[in-house]
Amino acid sequence: MKIQKKLTGCSRLMLLCLSLELLLEAGAGNIHYSVPEETDKGSFVGNIAKDLGLQPQELADGGVRIVSRGRMPLFALNPRSGSLITARRIDREELCAQSMPCLVSFNILVEDKMKLFPVEVEIIDINDNTPQFQLEELEFKMNEITTPGTRVSLPFGQDLDVGMNSLQSYQLSSNPHFSLDVQQGADGPQHPEMVLQSPLDREEEAVHHLILTASDGGEPVRSGTLRIYIQVVDANDNPPAFTQAQYHINVPENVPLGTQLLMVNATDPDEGANGEVTYSFHNVDHRVAQIFRLDSYTGEISNKEPLDFEEYKMYSMEVQAQDGAGLMAKVKVLIKVLDVNDNAPEVTITSVTTAVPENFPPGTIIALISVHDQDSGDNGYTTCFIPGNLPFKLEKLVDNYYRLVTERTLDRELISGYNITITAIDQGTPALSTETHISLLVTDINDNSPVFHQDSYSAYIPENNPRGASIFSVRAHDLDSNENAQITYSLIEDTIQGAPLSAYLSINSDTGVLYALRSFDYEQFRDMQLKVMARDSGDPPLSSNVSLSLFLLDQNDNAPEILYPALPTDGSTGVELAPLSAEPGYLVTKVVAVDRDSGQNAWLSYRLLKASEPGLFSVGLHTGEVRTARALLDRDALKQSLVVAVQDHGQPPLSATVTLTVAVADRISDILADLGSLEPSAKPNDSDLTLYLVVAAAAVSCVFLAFVIVLLAHRLRRWHKSRLLQASGGGLASMPGSHFVGVDGVRAFLQTYSHEVSLTADSRKSHLIFPQPNYADTLISQESCEKKGFLSAPQSLLEDKKEPFSQQAPPNTDWRFSQAQRPGTSGSQNGDDTGTWPNNQFDTEMLQAMILASASEAADGSSTLGGGAGTMGLSARYGPQFTLQHVPDYRQNVYIPGSNATLTNAAGKRDGKAPAGGNGNKKKSGKKEKK
């Protein structure tokens, strides 16, 4: 008991020293905790947050976690309390077997700071295991001649606990022949031996029953028992003897299964059954019994399972030899396992970033890596590296930890991802290595602007394109990815001819296709300059511009326009004069036309499409000049009708036609004399008016019917007055009727000859109007022109006039329009005019029938139009000065029935001349004096 107490005190002193040493080490840098084994899951181990200088909230926010190597996690972190707790029940015996102290080492990784803190937790043993023997019963024989003092080794008990909780003492049940002696072995465990105290007598007691008790030093004390049966046999005086006092062998760990490792040998000089020796393991660990096999007859030891240097570096076992009479001998066998390089390094990626932006600076941490090799010596010394052509490097930390960092700035546009191979190799022979791959994606940032495929674009578009048609497309590309490469197109706002660009063009924001919002006209504009912007969807967005030139191509969409002779609204033209004495090639007139197109679409050619007298006239192909093709003959008709076609050279060609009326005569007076023989009749117009009113009355309501009746009565009254005036013609001063001629196409005719005709000198209230039928195709024949007649008026009416009929007012020399008086509707005329402009087709037809030309002015050649005799001043129209402004003012020559006013020229008033309505009328001078 004294010895046991002494041992207990020593153990406590050793534990105290060991604890002080651990505390000193923890104070030097490591964090040290202790926890009893078999505590419940979640038991408190230590305040790790306090020891690390962290707040409990930082355990969750900072990514603090436990990094352990190759085993199930034994501990966990409580983020709320900041404490280290057990993750499961811990069995110290399973974890450390008989090792003391039992330390569990791991690292605390603070990912936010990328720091490692080593932590050691000592597992404190508790008395949770009872000492046990491998056998429940032990039976052996002892010769009765065995001398007192003979020692018999007994099986020793095993207690998985350590320290005071391990096996501390043995006790043998009381027996007069046997006693117990416990020997302290050199390798640590106690070896119980049974000592024969007095000689045996088989005849007195053949079998002895003993109980061996093994007890530990825990609180409470635990114990195990072994029943021993000793059979006393007859005398066998020679026990087996081994050839060696101890067997020792070195075996490489990679020996094949079933390899004979060594052979023990024991001899017995006895004969017969007393000399037959059998072998068996005695007092071996259960793991040893699982790995090795002992042949009971030959003593051969072989391995049943692979040897592992990393598990056991040396195996110690005891082999027992027993003869047939029960005598035994024991020998110790030591098998040392030699390490071979059979374990490749283990690479563990503790923390890794799978994606990194391309603009991160060098030194960015990508991964945290640990390397471990279970071999020893050079076989367990490892190095770690990556390929040298990568923009990364490995930096070694503590305890075989490495971190992978960027060595230079990454560029996703060059390489969008990396497959990094990390190789760990040991120094064994042959060297073993392990490769681990990390896939790293380089994420994009918006560092590239869109780039167009061309520096500038040009496109040619035919005019008259349909609205909404696709006319061009631009494309740009962006080296970035995802939304940073999603390009939208837009037009930079500009103006074209005062209108916004968006009114003409639009662009598809996704495809870059340009669409026309309207049909373009080459004659309006011929090109457009615009800029297209390509913008990506990055943050912030980047953009680039490109210039685009759109050129319109002319299409033949405009027919030639005939400038001269100008076409009045009713389609008729003026009358051109060709003298009878004209030689072949005589210039009669000239057709002037233009085309708003360009190029060959505007090249014009002229041809004579139709003529009333084929072969009489010709038209210049490119000049449009109408000339006589032969000399004029008496048999040629006085009126020649020509249809001239003007055609451009477009595809398809467009054309326009004009009808010319050529009068064959030497003088204008001849034509007027021939045409004046026709008697004007006012009744057709009255009948037309009546018919018009009847048709209109059928289409309108009853209200309009009353109005038509009143209007008809008014017209009949006027007609009655005119008949009364004609009946009083006895006192009317006569004038040849041939001096007043109705001419077909009067409005065009009077573009050249501007005259106005009046019957009396002072006809302010009533003028005699001679409506003339519209002869559209032929001039009045010569026979009709030879008829003589006089127009008469009542003498009383003539006496009221102050000017003679023979005196004619000079024509209005300002017969051209000013810029503000170009042909247009009545609403565009000068406000100074007192006349009324016809505003419907009916009034226009009446106006044409009532306009007369002055014969006397044409006969004496005093016209202010200019030109030589017989030409009627036509040459002035063919010169370069002829423009569209050379249009007569018809209002100087017009009398409106039912009105007491005539249309006048405001310019005449400014010149101090009398209005055309007064100066243009023929008045008799004699009557003027009488008045």
UniProtKB/Swiss-Prot annotation:
Molecular function (Gene Ontology), one example: calcium ion binding
Database matches in InterPro entries: Cadherin-like_dom, Cadherin-like_sf, Cadherin_C, Cadherin_CBD, Cadherin_CS, Cadherin_N, Protocadherin/Cadherin-CA
Pfam families: Cadherin, Cadherin_2, Cadherin_C_2, Cadherin_tail
UniProt GO BP: cell adhesion; homophilic cell adhesion via plasma membrane adhesion molecules; nervous system development
GO cellular component: plasma membrane
Transmembrane stretches, start-end: 693-713
Taxonomy, superkingdom: Eukaryota
UniProt keyword Transmembrane, yes or no: yes
PROSITE patterns the record matches: CADHERIN_1 (PS00232), CADHERIN_2 (PS50268)
Biased composition (Polar residues): 805-840
Tagged with keyword Glycoprotein: yes
Extracellular side: 29-692
Membrane topology value: Single-pass type I membrane protein
Segment forming the signal sequence: 1-28
Subcellular location, record wording: Cell membrane
Protein name stated in the entry: Protocadherin gamma-A1
